[in-house]
UniProtKB/Swiss-Prot annotation:
Mg(2+) binds at D10, A12, D186. Its EC number is 3.11.1.1. CDD domains: HAD_PHN. This is Phosphonoacetaldehyde hydrolase. GO terms for molecular function: magnesium ion binding; phosphoglycolate phosphatase activity; phosphonoacetaldehyde hydrolase activity. NCBIfam families: HAD-SF-IA-v3, phosphonatase. Belongs to the HAD-like hydrolase superfamily. PhnX family. Homodimer. Binds 1 Mg(2+) ion per subunit. The gene is phnX.
């Protein structure tokens, strides 16, 4: 049938951890612990969506971070430095990820509605398997249980922005065509992942990394501040090529209906 058969969802900032704070805070701590180098939360957010080793590598290439590194060590960050930061990052992330495992508002109801329509729920993450093995059961205790998940270090081909984690979901879920899949993510590399896999893509402008606020902060934010942050996030997601941008996963059902209408007219991603 020419309709959406599966959605492939990111984790932090998409289904759990409103604002995607678990990884950003840990990057700051890992740089400090490994080399006593300070980075800001805003800097930590810039490469979000990549695998975590690649994320650290990208942070080291940010001009401001590279300048700090050069001032301290007289050289740019090396692969050995990245390994050391990653070694500090992993135990911190494994220990703390369960504290950020609660589903974002609207996720459980949206998943139930999608499943009622016969849509399968795939997922993938920039987290490595050691972190996902803690996060997945913790999220399940809160009621979020996707049909499949893939970690960034599971596949020899690699992670985002390549298509491989998304395509592994297609295989595992037995989906007949990538055009019948929707990739949902709050960061640009995840949108690129979906596009590279030949899927429809939906960006989330409020619940995730680009908006960058806690749930409590979002609830008390002025309409003006929300609008500015939303526009900033949406522009980045559209620039990455997202077919649609909505606030959070709670808005996905309407998008699915719109995509189904386009598929019925013969359109493809």
């Amino acid at each position: 049938m020419n309709r959406i058969h599966a959605v492939i969802l990111d984790w932090a900032g998409t289904t759990v951890d409103f604002g995607s704070f678990a990884p950003t805070q840990i990057f700051v701590e890992a740089f400090r612990q490994a080399f006593d180098v300070e980075i800001t939360l805003a800097e930590a957010r810039v490469p979000m969506g990549l695998g975590k080793w690649q994320h650290i590598e990208a942070l080291g290439k940010l001009p401001a971070v590279d300048a700090r590194w050069q001032a301290k060590f007289g050289r740019s960050m090396s692969a050995a430095d990245i390994d050391a930061i990653y070694a500090a990052f992993m135990p911190l992330q494994i220990a703390k990820v369960v504290d950020f495992s609660s589903p974002i508002a609207g996720v459980i109801d949206t998943i139930a509605a999608l499943r009622a329509e016969g849509i399968k729920i795939g997922s993938c993450s920039g987290y490595p398997r050691a972190v996902m093995e803690r996060l997945v059961p913790a999220a399940a205790e809160h009621g979020y249980r996707p049909d499949h998940w893939v970690a960034t270090d599971d596949l020899a081909a690699g992670g985002r922005p390549g298509p491989w984690m998304a395509l592994q979901n297609v295989i595992a879920l037995g989906i007949d065509a990538v055009a019948h899949c929707v990739k949902v993510d709050d960061a640009a590399p995840g949108i690129s992942e979906g596009l590279n896999a030949g899927m429809w893509t939906v960006g989330l402008a409020v619940s995730g990394n680009e908006f960058g606020a806690t749930w409590d902060a979002y609830q008390t934010m002025s309409k003006e501040d929300v609008a500015v942050r939303r526009e900033h996030a949406a522009s980045k997601l559209y620039a990455a090529g997202a077919h649609y941008v909505v606030d959070s996963l709670a808005d996905l059902s309407g998008v699915i209906a719109h995509i189904n209408a386009r598929l019925a007219q013969g359109e493809r991603p």
